[in-house]
């Protein structure tokens, strides 16, 4: 799991066509809001808008993680989750 730029969509299309991967599911895309057109045409690909965290359970976990990061920072600890700049 990761943000869109972590996935090379051209390589993904190639791997799916050659059978190296049997399927893929994406809710973020390499080049912003839209996936490569080839991915839209493939039966073994599921694409959704960026809604992977739209459950109450996930949002509670995210809120707790933020709180733990802030508390850890204030106490001089390493954050639970680090933000890396590209």
Give a label for each model feature.
Residues 1-86:
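Rossmann-like dinucleotide-binding domain for NAD(H)/NADP(H)
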């Amino acid at each position: 799991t990761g943000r869109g730029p972590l996935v090379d969509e051209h390589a993904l299309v190639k791997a799916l066509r050659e059978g190296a991967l049997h399927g893929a599911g994406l809710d973020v895309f390499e080049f912003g809001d839209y996936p490569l057109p080839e991915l839209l045409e493939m039966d073994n690909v599921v694409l959704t808008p960026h809604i992977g965290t739209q459950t109450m359970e996930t949002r509670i976990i995210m809120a707790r993680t933020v709180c733990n990061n802030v508390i850890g920072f204030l106490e001089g600890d390493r954050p639970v989750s680090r933000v890396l700049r590209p």
